[in-house]
């Protein structure tokens, strides 16, 4: 029964027959053909409230007449019809024609059926047919409001809208069109017409259980359009049948999905031609049931799907798809064709395009697909699936085409067959491609003539058991991201190529499966792959031959993978295999591979050959290049064997694995070849492996990574390196139990940059023997494992490790390490030897080096270590551990060696025994060191002669309860940077001795625990502790410290701290100096014995001794020793209450800039004995400061020392200081009395000896300086008291100013020594007693010590004056010594003068010392020292002046030298001459202390001995001699006089040269250049005497050189007279030498001894000649020829240098005025007798020395 039957019959207008309806509104339904055939025309506007039905039999098929009925309705002539629901042909044949531009509006449209009770008495011919023609339209709308009838008075009935009615999805609604529910429906849209469906179109639904037999039809032609705004879908029947025909630019547009023919036996035909278009904005699903047929033909048309396309799917379906003539099929998502079992698909694309997201064709078992194309373009962006299913077959044949896919699946399934042939075509896949996937598949892939297969993803061909594939590429390209061919058991692959390019960027898999076989034969080809898998599987066989071809893989390559595989790899003549990643060949049990390389290259990132049990690998090569950038694996498996034999070849690998597996055998031989590995190399891995590695000369193995050989139990390795290189980043040889390794080398270079492991395993053994070799490693592990045995011998060889080295690791291991001369082991990291319980190590280093960052030898319980060395160098920069473990033992014995470590642990463990012995060796630790650390340990350290032990950190020896430690240092140096701990632990015993050595430590701790017993001795040593020096710190502890001839410097000292502690410290000629504090005997009832003797020093910035109550302290400082308490204000001796302290300083010193308190505790008692030259130069010593305390200071028998107390008897204490038998003792800085009161109980007595007052002192009280004693002031003092100086006593103020009340002087007071000025101020009187004296110092001109007496003077004191050569007096005068303001009754007399430490006694009333005379005079009340210069220096200076001037001649001082030629002269005659000279003058001392007059007389005679002339120039030589005398008289400022006398003679030679002497008598005229030179010897006798009874005689010799040059020029005149000008230069040098002269006191006197004169000058001369004409003169005609007068006047300026005016009198320099002088000279020479001349000259010198001289001489020629 129809669900809406009642509504359709109520208010209905039923028409049977023919009729016309125009312009009507029907309030009910309009039913055409209810019981009979009917035919109706509708014109105008008709609005129907309910149903508009044609041939519906009232909606019930049983009511239809037998055979059915026919009814039709035509809406024409632009009519407009509206109806709520329109039904055409419900179980009868109905036709609705809309023509002539008419329009139908309806909310639901049913074409062929709305009934659910279809019966068999009505055939499918009873269809409904809808025809829309000639520009007409049908609109299936949602409501009346969407139509022109929205304002019509007749409103459409919404209640009759069908909501279900067995539609497939269970629902229909307004806006839906249903086609072919109860029979096939037909819709024709023609001639520019339109069908517009607002919601869904339901196609060919049928009735449940009764499918339609004929397909419904939709015909869209001639530019018509069918628009569906919802889905286009099928109904509920088992099959859907539809024929869709489109032609001539027609369009089907579905806004959502198309899903028709979705039941079994569906039959869908789609035909579109002439630019028609089908568009689905959703999915496109047609004929998807079993046994369905889909036939799509596109001819110059388009199919466009915006969703998923599914065509002809279902078992047994047949799909034909013909796309041609420029057609385009586009499915933006997936497209599936013929999916199901037994499907058939025939896809032909000719000059057209197929574009889809994913394309699946013939997916199902037994599917048969044929795809052909010419000029085709196939694009499947996602997947491309063809014939996927068992027994499926695919034939693809394309010519001139392009196939662009995403992923591809072709011929996939059991026994599938695939034939893919490309001719000048390209298949391009952006994803994966699978071809022939399945067992027993058969695949033929043929690429011809520039064809290509380019797969961006994986390409898999013939995958399955017994699958076979034949790939032939001729001048073509096969490319895939991954390429897999023949995968499965018994797969068979044949690949041939000529000029081929095979590319598989990711993987390349060939014949992968058991019993698979692969034959690859390429010539002139290129194979570029990613990863490769060839011949992989049990018993697989692979034959790969390349001839002039290249296989390149960017990834991995696997060949012959599987048990019993057989692989032959042959590379000939310039062929290459280049694998960027791993290459694996013959992997599997009993797999075999034969690799032959001849002049070719095999390269891989990783290369693996023969992996598996009993695998067999043979690799040979000549001129081969093998590269494996990552790994290189050969014969890896139990019982595997590898034979590698290369000559003239290069093997470059990354990681290498050769002969790995139990009982594997490896033979690697390199001849003039190189193996280089950038990664690891592992050889002979496995139990019982045997590995032989032989490197012949010029060969090398260089492994950048790790190299492992013979790894496994019972593995053995034999490595021979003969003048070759073996290197690796890490190297492991023989790793496993009972492994045996033999390594020998001569001229070998072994390098292992990271680790080097040899014979590592229980019972393993290693023998390494190298000579003239180098071993460079990183970390080393040799002989590791229980009971492992290691022998390492280096001869003239070096082992260097940049990391760690571990040898003999394991229990009961035995390790022997021998380094022969010139050998070395250098480990940059840690070195560990014999680590394990009961392990033993023997290390011998003979003139060799052993070094490591950290070194551990014998670490484990009962470990035993013996280390010996001679000339050894041991270095362990970080830690050095030897015999670390309970009951371990260590013996280290080194001589002439060097040991440098970081932290050290030697013999650490309970009951360990340690012996460390150094002899002439150095031991340096940059960190800490523990020796014998643990309870009950025994440690013995001996640092012998010439050794140096340096620990930068802490050193612990014998640390632990009941530990025993002995540390001896002899003739060595010990340097501990931090702390030295010796014997730390309860009841420990520690003994340390340092002899003739140096010890430096940051801290020193000995016996720091309860009941510890420690001792330390040092002799001739230096000990320096920067930090704490702690000894016996613990209750009941005992410490004995004995230091002889040693220096101990420390920071803080704690010696004996604890209750009842006992400390004995003895210093003998030693220094114990703390930069901070020293605490001794800290604790109640502590006992301290401190003995400091024989030039020892005990010093601390703070010293506290006996801090506890009832402490007993005995301190003895003797033998010129020093006790220095430093700068702290808290040093104490006897700080505890009731403490008793005895401090004896005997011939020793106490210093301190801070404070020292003796007897600080209440009721404490202290005695300070300063004896036998004790010195207390302390700034702040307090005595008896506690309540009821008492302190006594006894200073006795002292030659030197210092005492600086600042507080004595403070509070209620009592103190006194007694000096008895002191000499040079010092009482220093700011001494004040204790109670700040009258100091009535404070007495300072200088009973015997010498006491110094140092610093600026201010005190009260009595100071008594008794007979035979001396008190020195070392500062400026102020004394509120009387200074009593007893007879035979001395007080020395040392140049410091003193201010005191008064002086009672019976002894001697020294103001200064002449080096510093002292002023003494007395507020009251100076009382002198007979025999008393005062010494004053003078410091120069009127500077001296002065005593200022405000009161009176009485008695008589002698005065001593002291000075030195530094205190210069320039001019005599009076110097104040004593100033008296009161009564000056006292007298002073001059006793002596001390100069430069020598005393000169008074002579009469004066003292002559040096150049000065001293006398004491009283003027008014004051006393002065008069100082005057002695006269004798003036006599000595003028004696020398006379000697330097005497016998000095210039040319014109010789008579006859002004001679001119005359008419009567014989120019060549020689002559004799005689000359007399008188010279006198006066001079004075530079400060006018002396004035002198002098005179000089000489007579000289000479003669020419030879002359010569050339007629113009004239020369002659002469000799000369003479004698002379001189006298002088000097007067001083105090009218003392001295005279000097000189007598002497001279001998000499002279020479004269004169230019321009004519031999013509009347023409002669002398002018031109002339020279004069002479040499002279002088001898003098001298004497000096004075009114001071001084007399001295001395002889002097002299030598003089003279030179003179001039030029005589005539300046005109009238004969017989002429005028001349004559410039000249005179030079002279005179030297004197003679004996030493001494004054009366024995002082040396020097005198002037050299003079150099340079005197330029000019003379003007006049000549007058008169010839005799008188007869009266005739009688003299033989003698008187003519008279000649030569007169001259001129001068010169004399420059003088040399010592010619100074004398030194016993270091006093006296100098006379000197200056360069201007000398005026004049003279006249007469010739009035034949051949005779007379000379008279005079000269006057103008300077400080007024000098006048005259010369008279004569000359005669003969």
From Swiss-Prot:
It is a peripheral membrane protein. One of its GO terms (cellular component) is cell outer membrane. Residues 1-12 form the signal peptide. It comes from the Bacteria. Residues 1465-1758 form the Autotransporter domain. It is found in: Cell outer membrane. Keywords: Cell outer membrane, Membrane, Plasmid, Signal, Transmembrane, Transmembrane beta strand. InterPro entries: Autotransporte_beta, Autotransporte_beta_dom_sf, Autotransporter_pectin_lyase_C, OM_autotransptr_brl_dom, Pectin_lyase_fold/virulence. NCBIfam families: autotrans_barl. This is Uncharacterized protein YuaO. It comes from Escherichia coli (strain K12).
């Amino acid at each position: 029964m129809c669900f809406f039957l009642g509504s359709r019959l109520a208010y209905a207008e039923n028409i049977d027959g023919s009729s016309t309806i125009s312009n009507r509104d029907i309030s009910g339904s309009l039913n055409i053909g209810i019981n009979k055939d009917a035919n109706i025309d509708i014109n105008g506007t008709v609005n129907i409230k309910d149903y508009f039905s044609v041939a519906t039999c009232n909606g019930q098929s049983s009511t239809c007449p037998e055979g059915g009925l026919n009814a039709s309705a035509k809406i024409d002539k632009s009519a407009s019809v509206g109806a709520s629901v329109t039904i055409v042909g419900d179980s009868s044949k109905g036709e609705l024609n809309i023509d002539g531009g008419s329009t139908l509006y309806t909310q639901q449209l049913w074409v062929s059926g709305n009934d659910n009770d279809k019966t068999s008495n009505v055939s499918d011919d009873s269809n409904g047919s809808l025809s829309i023609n000639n520009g007409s339209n049908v609109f299936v709308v949602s409501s009346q409001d969407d139509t022109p009838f929205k304002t019509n008075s007749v409103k459409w009935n919404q209640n009759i809208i069908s909501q279900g009615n067995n539609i497939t999805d269970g629902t229909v609604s307004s806006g839906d069109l249903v086609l072919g529910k109860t029979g096939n429906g037909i819709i024709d849209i023609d001639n520019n017409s339109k069908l517009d469906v607002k919601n869904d179109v339901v196609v060919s639904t049928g009735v449940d259980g009764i499918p339609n037999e004929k397909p419904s039809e939709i015909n869209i032609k001639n530019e018509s359009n069918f628009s569906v705004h919802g889905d286009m879908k099928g109904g509920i029947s088992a099959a859907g049948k539809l024929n869709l025909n489109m032609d001539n630019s027609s369009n089907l547009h579905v806004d959502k999905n198309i899903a028709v023919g979705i039941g079994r036996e569906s039959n869908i035909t789609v035909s579109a031609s002439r630019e028609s278009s089908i568009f689905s904005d959703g999915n496109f699903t047609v004929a998807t049931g079993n046994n369905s047929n889909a036939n799509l033909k596109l001819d110059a048309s388009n199919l466009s799907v915006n969703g998923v396309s599914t065509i002809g799917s279902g078992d047994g379906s047949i799909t034909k798809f013909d796309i041609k003539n420029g057609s385009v099929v586009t499915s933006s998502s997936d497209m599936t064709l013929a999916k199901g079992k037994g499907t058939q698909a025939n896809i032909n694309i000719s000059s057209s395009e197929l574009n889809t997201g994913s394309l699946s064709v013939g997916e199902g078992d037994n599917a048969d697909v044929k795809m052909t194309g010419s000029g085709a373009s196939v694009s499947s962006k996602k997947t491309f699936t063809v014939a996927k299913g068992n027994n499926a077959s695919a034939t693809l044949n394309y010519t001139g085409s392009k196939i662009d896919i995403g992923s591809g699946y072709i011929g996939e399934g059991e026994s599938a067959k695939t034939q893919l042939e490309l001719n000048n075509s390209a298949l391009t896949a952006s994803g994966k491609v699978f071809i022939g996937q399945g067992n027993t598949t058969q695949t033929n892939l043929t690429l011809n003539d520039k064809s290509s297969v380019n797969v961006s993803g994986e390409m898999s061909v013939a995958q399955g058991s017994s699958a076979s594939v034949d790939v032939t590429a001729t001048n073509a390209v096969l490319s895939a991201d991954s390429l897999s061919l023949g995968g499965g058991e018994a797969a068979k692959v044949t690949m041939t190529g000529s000029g081929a390019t095979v590319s598989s960027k990711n993987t390349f898999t060939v014949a992968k499966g058991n019993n698979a076989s692969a034959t690859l034969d390429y010539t002139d080809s290129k194979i570029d792959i990613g990863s490769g898998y060839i011949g992989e599987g049990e018993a697989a066989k692979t034959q790969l031959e390349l001839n002039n071809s290249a296989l390149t893989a960017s990834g991995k390559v696997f060949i012959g993978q599987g048990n019993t595989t057989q692989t032959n790899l042959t590379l000939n003549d310039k062929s290459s295999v280049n694998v960027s990643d791993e290459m694996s060949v013959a992997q599997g049990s009993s797999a075999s591979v034969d690799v032959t390389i001849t002049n070719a290259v095999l390269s891989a990132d990783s290369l693996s050959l023969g992996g598996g049990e009993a695998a067999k690998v043979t690799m040979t090569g000549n001129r081969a290049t093998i590269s494996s950038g990552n790994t290189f694996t050969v014969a890896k498996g139990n019982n595997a064997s590898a034979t590698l034999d290369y000559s003239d070849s290069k093997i470059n690998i990354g990681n290498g694995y050769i002969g790995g597996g139990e009982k594997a055998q490896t033979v690697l031989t390199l001849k003039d070849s190189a193996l280089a590995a950038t990664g690891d190399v592992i050889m002979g891995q496995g139990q019982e492996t045997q590995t032989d590695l032989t490197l012949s000369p010029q060969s090398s193995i260089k492994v950048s990574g790790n190299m492992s050989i013979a790894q496994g139990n019972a593995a053995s390795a034999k490595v021979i390196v003969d003048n070759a290189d073996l290197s690796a980043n890490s190297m492991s040889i023989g790793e496993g139990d009972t492994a045996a390794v033999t390594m020998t080398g001569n001229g070998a270079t072994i390098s292992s940059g990271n680790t080097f492991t040899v014979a590592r395993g229980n019972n393993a053994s290693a023998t390494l023997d190298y000579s003239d070799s180098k071993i460079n490693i990183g970390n080393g592990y040799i002989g590791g494992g229980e009971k492992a045995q290691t022998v390492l011998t280096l001869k003239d060889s070096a082992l260097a490790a940049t990391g760690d080295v571990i040898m003999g690791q394991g229990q009961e291991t035995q390790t022997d390490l021998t380094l022969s001369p010139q050998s070395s082991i250098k480990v940059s990291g840690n070195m560990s030897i014999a680590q394990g319980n009961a392990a033993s190590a023997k290390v011998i280093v003979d003139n060799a080096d052993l070094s490591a960052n950290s070194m551990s030898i014998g670490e484990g319980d009962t470990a035993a270590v013996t280390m010996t060395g001679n000339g050894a160098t041991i270095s362990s920069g970080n830690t050095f551990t030897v015999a670390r473990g309970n009951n371990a033992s260590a013996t280290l014995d080194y001589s002439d060696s060097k040991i440098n470590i970081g932290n050290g642990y030697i013999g650490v463990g309970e009951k360990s025994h340690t012996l460390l012995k150094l002899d002439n060796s150095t031991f340096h630790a940059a960190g800490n060191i523990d020796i014998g650390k643990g309870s009950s340990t025994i440690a013995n350290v001996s640092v012998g002669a010439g050794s140096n032990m340096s620990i930068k950190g802490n050193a612990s020896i014998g640390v632990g309860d009941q530990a025993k430690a002995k540390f001896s240092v002899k003739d060595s140096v010990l340097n501990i940077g931090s702390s030295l701990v010796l014997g730390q632990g309860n009841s420990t015993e520690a003994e340390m001795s340092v002899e003739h050595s140096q010890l430096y430590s940051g801290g020193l701790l000995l016996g720091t625990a309860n009941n510890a017993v420690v001792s330390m001795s040092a002799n001739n040593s230096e000990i320096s502790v920067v930090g704490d020096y702690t000894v016996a710190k613990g209750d009941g502890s005992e410490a004995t410290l004995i230091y002889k001839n040693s220096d101990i410097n420390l920071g803080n000292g704690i010696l004996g701290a604890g209750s009842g502690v006992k400390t004995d410290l003895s210093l003998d000629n030693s220094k114990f100096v703390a930069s901070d504090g020293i605490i001794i005997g800290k604790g109640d009832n502590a006992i301290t014995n401190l003995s400091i003797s024989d030039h020892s020093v005990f010093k601390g910035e703070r010293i506290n001794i006996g801090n506890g109550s009832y402490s007993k302290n005995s301190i003895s400082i003797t033998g010129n020793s020093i006790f220095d308490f430093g700068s702290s204000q808290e040093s104490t001796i006897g700080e505890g209450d009731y403490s008793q302290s005895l401090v004896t300083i005997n011939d020793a010193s106490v210093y301190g800039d801070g404070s020292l308190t003796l007897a600080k505790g209440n009721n404490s008692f202290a005695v300070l004995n300063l004896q036998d030259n004790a010195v207390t130069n302390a700034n702040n010593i307090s005595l008896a400061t506690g309540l009821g305390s008492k302190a006594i200071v006894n200073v006795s028998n002292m030659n030197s020392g210092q005492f600086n107390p600042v507080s004595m008897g403070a509070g209620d204490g009592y103190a006194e200081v007694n000096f008895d038998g002191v000499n040079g003792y010092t009482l220093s800085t700011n001494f004040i009395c204790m109670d700040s009161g009258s100091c009535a109980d404070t007495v300072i007595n200088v009973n015997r000896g010498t006491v110094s007052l140092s610093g600026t002192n201010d005190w009260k009280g009595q100071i008594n300086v008794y007979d035979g004693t001396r008190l020195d002031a070392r500062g400026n003092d102020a004394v509120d008291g009387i200074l009593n100086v007893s007879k035979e006593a001395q007080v020395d103020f040392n140049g410091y100013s003193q201010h005191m009340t008064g002086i009672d002087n019976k002894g001697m007071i020294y103001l200064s020594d002449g080096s510093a000025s002292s002023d003494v101020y007395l507020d009251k009187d100076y009382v002198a007693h007979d025999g008393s004296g005062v010494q004053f110092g003078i410091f120069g001109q009127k500077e001296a010590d002065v005593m200022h007496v405000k009161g009176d003077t009485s008695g008589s004191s002698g005065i001593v004056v002291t000075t030195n050569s530094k205190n210069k007096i320039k001019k005599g005068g009076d110097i104040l010594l004593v100033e008296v303001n009161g009564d000056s009754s006292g007298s002073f007399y001059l006793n002596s003068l001390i100069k430069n430490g020598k005393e000169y006694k008074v002579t009469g009333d004066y003292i002559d010392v040096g150049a000065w005379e001293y006398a004491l005079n009283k003027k008014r009340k004051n006393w002065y020292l008069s100082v005057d210069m002695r006269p004798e220096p003036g006599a000595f200076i003028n004696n020398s002046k006379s000697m330097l001037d005497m016998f000095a001649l210039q040319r014109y001082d010789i008579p006859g030298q002004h001679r001119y030629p005359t008419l009567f002269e014989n120019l060549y005659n020689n002559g004799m001459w005689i000359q007399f000279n008188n010279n006198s003058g006066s001079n004075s001392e530079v400060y006018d202390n002396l004035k002198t007059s002098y005179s000089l007389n000489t007579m000289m005679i000479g003669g020419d001995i030879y002359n010569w002339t050339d007629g113009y120039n004239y020369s002659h030589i002469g000799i000369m001699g003479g004698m002379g005398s001189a006298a002088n008289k000097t007067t001083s400022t105090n009218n003392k006089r001295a005279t000097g006398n000189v007598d002497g003679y001279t001998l000499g030679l002279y020479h004269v040269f004169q230019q321009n002497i004519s031999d013509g008598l009347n023409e002669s005229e002398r002018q031109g250049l002339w020279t004069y030179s002479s040499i002279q010897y002088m001898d003098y006798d001298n004497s000096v005497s004075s009114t001071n009874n001084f007399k001295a005689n001395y002889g002097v010799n002299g030598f003089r050189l003279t030179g003179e040059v001039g030029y005589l020029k005539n300046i005109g005149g009238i004969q017989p007279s002429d005028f001349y000008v004559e410039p000249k230069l005179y030079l002279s040098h005179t030297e004197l030498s003679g004996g030493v002269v001494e004054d009366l006191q024995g002082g040396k006197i020097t005198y002037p001894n050299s003079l150099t004169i340079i005197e330029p000058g000019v003379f003007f001369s006049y000549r007058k000649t008169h010839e005799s004409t008188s007869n009266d003169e005739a009688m003299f005609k033989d003698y008187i020829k003519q008279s000649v007068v030569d007169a001259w006047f001129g001068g010169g300026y004399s420059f003088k240098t040399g010592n010619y005016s100074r004398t030194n009198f016993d270091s006093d320099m006296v100098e006379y005025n000197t200056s360069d002088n201007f000398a005026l000279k004049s003279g006249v020479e007469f010739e009035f007798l034949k051949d005779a001349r007379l000379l008279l000259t005079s000269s006057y010198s103008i300077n400080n020395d007024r000098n006048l001289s005259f010369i008279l001489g004569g000359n005669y020629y003969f």
